[in-house]
Amino acid sequence: MPIRILSPQLANQIAAGEVVERPASVVKELVENSLDAGANKIQIDIENGGANLIRIRDNGCGIPKEELSLALARHATSKIADLDDLEAILSLGFRGEALASISSVSRLTLTSRTEEQTEAWQVYAQGRDMETTIKPASHPVGTTVEVANLFFNTPARRKFLRTDKTEFAHIDEVIRRIALTKFNTAFTLTHNGKIVRQYRPAFDLNQQLKRVAVICGDDFVKNALRIDWKHDDLHLSGWVATPNFSRTQNDLSYCYINGRMVRDKVISHAIRQAYAQYLPTDAYPAFVLFIDLNPHDVDVNVHPTKHEVRFHQQRLIHDFIYEGISYALNNQEQLNWHTEQSAVENHEENTVREPQPNYSIRPNRAAAGQNSFAPQYHEKPQQNQPHFSNTPVLPNHVSTGYRDYRSDAPSKTEQRLYAELLRTLPPTAQKDISNTAQQNISDTAKIISTEIIECSSHLRALSLIENRALLLQQNQDFFLLSLEKLQRLQWQLALQQIQIEQQPLLIPIVFRLTEAQFQAWQQYSDNFKKIGFEFIENQAQLRLTLNKVPNVLRTQNLQKCVMAMLTRDENSSPFLTALCAQLECKTFDALADALNLLSETERLLTQTNRTAFTQLLKPVNWQPLLDEI
């Protein structure tokens, strides 16, 4: 068969295979076009699940008569004009494929009128060459698109449609997702002439919560925590549910990037990590999150249906989302929005004004060739780049910090090091000690692991008991070692080193203090500096900016830790001991992890501080048990 150019209709039908999956795909594309046209009132009429008729009516700006034919042409759009526009997309549509693809697999009619026109015009395309026909019509300002007999000319596609009920359920879900991000737009959804959904415009927070309650349920709103988290051009807002409102399936997870509904692995991982300590692995968090960022920093042109995006700074986005959600979950009593509006206003009075984003949005285009959606971006001069700053939303609210989000699974290097660490004894020694251990400790504790491992020249680790302690043997003596106390000792030893490795924070943490807290800071500033913290002090505004932390504490909740140290009783305990008492200890599910901690601690021991370690060893007396045998 010779090479030849496909007919316009066939080319559009091929494109429709990606764009038009089912009636819900048509509704999504057409409603997004209405929103891009500035509509604040959209009506969606469906018949027989969308197979017979889909009608979208809006009150947007409309399409001029001379552009109606182009509207049905492939790769014709008013939303971008050049490559710069493509790299800074804020509109929902931009490829110019939807109308052409839909019209090739259905009987599509487009009727529109602009405010400048005295009459409306209607256009439709038909035939192998998709020739358009324009005729006058009666219509108010705005646009109506009717899609009749979807897949009438591709019977193979039509027979794969589900029942009317199933297809309409998918359409309903599309409208729900769009209504969650376009609060100022009214949506009406009908099926076979009956109104099924009607979302009124929501202009204030109470009205927005009502819409969220209608879509996500009253229980979600009752358990919702409000997020308003900012850093430079990044802004995270919305609601996350408390852990007790976890879901057995992932059916209440809505995330939007610059108003676009997306699915992204980086965002999903950050959210799961933030909930990791609260939810079991088989539970799912519920959330409605809006992420606004510079459009130059995200690429939305990576998926046929634009459901996926790619971030230029994935690590920054991940850490920003993780810290924002973690702060909300750790401070539920502060962020819970079951308060009066006056309380919210009081919080806003205590905020620090966030610097404006370093990009500006141009007004709607005046003529074709101008992009009304792509912002003009101005690079910051590198030599004058200031330190990061952040806006607290509540009193003592702090920005995000560095987050090490490595996978929970050990890397190949870690596995190799573990293998070297877990060197087993010779078989004869294993047998002797194993028999002794089984004879002495059977039925006395829940033994998670019974491997016999040599962890130092003096102590041998026999077992990890209830994830809380190590059972150790030295000659004929046995000891229990608390892992929590061992971890706190390891922190103290690491922070007492002469040279402490520092970790710069990806996003510095900003503290707004009271006068009493600032006085406490001045008293403890040398102590913080000695152990590796680096602050920038602003005495006039009673503000501290944390830029560097000790590497050993990089995964800790530094906001909570620092504030606790500035409000503690100065006579309670030494500074370093009090600081380590504020740190959160990890849980140990494997003997290898516990042995790694023991090895790290022994490496830091010296002749002067070895006593502190030996005091943690609690002798085990087997004699009463032996007497009962």
Swiss-Prot record:
InterPro entries registered for this protein in UniProt:
DNA_mismatch_repair_CS, DNA_mismatch_repair_MutL, DNA_mismatch_S5_2-like, HATPase_C_sf, MutL/Mlh/PMS, MutL/Mlh/Pms-like, MutL_C, MutL_C_dimsub
Q: Which HAMAP family does the record associate with it?
A: DNA_mis_repair
Q: Where are the transmembrane segments?
A: none
Similarity comment:
Belongs to the DNA mismatch repair MutL/HexB family.
The organism of origin for this protein: Haemophilus influenzae (strain PittEE)
Query: Which Gene Ontology cellular component terms are annotated?
Result: mismatch repair complex
Q: Name one GO molecular function term.
A: mismatched DNA binding
Q: What is this protein called?
A: DNA mismatch repair protein MutL
Chain spans, region Disordered: 376-396
Describe the task this protein carries out. Answer: This protein is involved in the repair of mismatches in DNA. It is required for dam-dependent methyl-directed DNA mismatch repair. May act as a 'molecular matchmaker', a protein that promotes the formation of a stable complex between two or more DNA-binding proteins in an ATP-dependent manner without itself being part of a final effector complex.
Q: Which gene encodes it?
A: mutL
Q: Where is the composition biased (Polar residues)?
A: 382-396
